[in-house]
């Protein structure tokens, strides 16, 4: 019964978190946004003491329920482990705890947080690992499905669906995500929860508390006949049947062992005052797993990446011609001295110190402005660029979805008064000066009237007009940069502010 309850709740949590990352409309966040906010590391970085306290108390009462129910990467590993074992259900075997590795990784993780090595912190956070995988592989599939429905509906004169662009936001991040995903999948398919009990820093922290849990899975020595059914079904490899011991720090409370014991020797019981036993039996040799299944999983990931790349290339080729009459040159990103980060982030330093690079804000951005950074010091964290859109003053989506406090929640009025950067005019690229043609596109579309058109020749009021930027009024939304007709570089671009200002 407990196993069925755990499976049901775990699958619901996995589906809810996945829907958060694949949804591009923003509709689901109003209902499911709390799922991201109860994840351990985002809550810690957001200084959400209530959530952290509840998770620790839950662990002290019931063990590592967080790992078996709430953590999306943990539940995902259970799914992979089930598929990886196949119909023959290759047995698991007990292994000695690799405490030196677990606490070594945790020490490196804490040191990285203290020293500001944010890329390493983001790389190890289990919630962010799953979020990036869902964003990189599942959201494009979701969008392609939506585009197919939109195409079919349009033929029937229905516009219930609308097409969205599917494009590769960051190749370096995609490679990192694929490598991490393959690592997790291979470990889960071969040995269950190996990743959780050797690499995951959140699992190590909660494992320390779970040793003192009030309710734990224990073995009744009087009833146990040593059949090893429980150990052969333990994904955490923490049951030592020979010594009737269960390593409480590694048990993820999956409850799989409970239904396997026909003698009632193993159970989830009140264990206050009983120290969690540490088994010391040498690890038996692990049974070989089917190589073909591993190759299939790896091949599937490579195929998904190839399909995504092919679709992006096809889309890019399709938009290069304007009705077959003129070439359309894609905009290139200008070289900025300071990256632009979203309103609500307060500035580059605040975003760096709080962001887990989960990509939830990138998934939710409706204007295609946010994308993962390639820079080493902010790797995979979001930054803004305006080649495909601009940050509309009425949009506050990213601040609404961020679970880690990296982008603080703001309303529309607050956003209109936050200066994230200022526009810079490039004289040598401006069309009135290069092509001797009237333009003024930037001034017409500036939502805060920070750009005015002035004569290019002060002595001749009738000369072609060029833009003049009022930096004190500009909020850095990027409308001017995005809508500038100059190619491949815009004649006006936004330079970011290291620290945001309030106008």
Where does each model-flagged region fall?
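Non-ligating segments of multi-cofactor redox enzymes
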Residues: 1-244, 249-250, 256-503
């Amino acid at each position: 019964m407990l196993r069925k309850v755990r499976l049901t709740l775990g699958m619901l949590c996995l589906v809810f978190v996945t829907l958060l990352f694949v949804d591009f409309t923003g509709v689901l966040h109003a209902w499911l946004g709390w799922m991201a906010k109860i994840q351990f590391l985002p809550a810690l970085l957001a200084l959400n003491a209530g959530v952290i306290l509840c998770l620790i108390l839950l662990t002290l009462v019931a063990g590592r329920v967080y790992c078996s129910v709430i953590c999306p990467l943990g539940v995902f590993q259970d799914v992979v482990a089930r598929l990886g074992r196949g119909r023959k259900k290759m047995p698991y075997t007990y292994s000695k705890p690799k405490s030196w590795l677990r606490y070594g990784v945790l020490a490196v993780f804490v040191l990285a947080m203290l020293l500001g090595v944010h890329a390493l912190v983001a790389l190890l956070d289990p919630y962010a690992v799953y979020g990036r995988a869902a964003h990189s592989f599942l959201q494009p599939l979701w969008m392609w499905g939506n585009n197919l429905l939109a195409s079919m509906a349009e033929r029937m004169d229905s516009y219930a669906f609308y097409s969205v662009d599917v494009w590769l936001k960051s190749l370096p991040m995609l490679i990192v995500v694929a490598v991490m995903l393959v690592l997790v999948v291979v470990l889960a398919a071969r040995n269950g929860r190996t990743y959780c009990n050797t690499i995951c820093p959140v699992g190590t922290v909660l494992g320390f508390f779970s040793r003192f849990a009030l309710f734990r899975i224990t073995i009744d020595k009087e009833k146990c006949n040593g059949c090893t059914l429980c150990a052969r079904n333990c994904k955490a490899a923490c049951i030592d049947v020979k010594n009737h011991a269960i390593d409480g720090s590694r048990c993820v409370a999956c409850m799989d062992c409970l239904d396997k014991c026909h003698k009632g020797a193993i159970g989830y019981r009140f264990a206050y005052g009983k120290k969690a036993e540490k088994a010391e039996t040498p690890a038996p040799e692990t049974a070989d797993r089917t190589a073909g299944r591993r190759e299939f999983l790896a091949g599937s990931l490579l195929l998904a990446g190839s399909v995504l790349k092919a679709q992006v290339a096809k889309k890019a080729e399709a938009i290069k011609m304007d009705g077959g009459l003129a070439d359309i040159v894609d905009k290139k990103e200008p070289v900025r001295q300071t990256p632009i980060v979203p309103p609500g982030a307060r500035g580059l330093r605040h975003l760096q110190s709080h962001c887990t690079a989960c990509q939830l804000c990138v998934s939710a951005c409706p204007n295609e402005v946010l994308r993962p950074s390639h820079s080493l010091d902010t790797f995979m964290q979001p930054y803004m660029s305006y080649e495909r859109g601009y940050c509309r003053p009425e949009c506050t989506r990213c601040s609404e979805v961020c679970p880690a406090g990296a982008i603080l929640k703001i309303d529309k009025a607050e956003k209109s008064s936050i200066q994230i950067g200022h526009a810079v005019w490039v004289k040598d690229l401006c069309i009135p000066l290069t092509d001797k043609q009237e333009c003024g596109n930037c001034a017409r579309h500036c939502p805060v009237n920070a750009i005015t058109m002035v004569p290019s020749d002060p002595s001749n009021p009738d000369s072609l007009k060029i833009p003049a930027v009022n930096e004190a009024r500009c909020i850095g939304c990027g409308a001017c940069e995005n809508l500038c007709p100059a190619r491949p570089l815009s004649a006006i671009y936004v330079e970011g502010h290291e620290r945001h200002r309030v106008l």
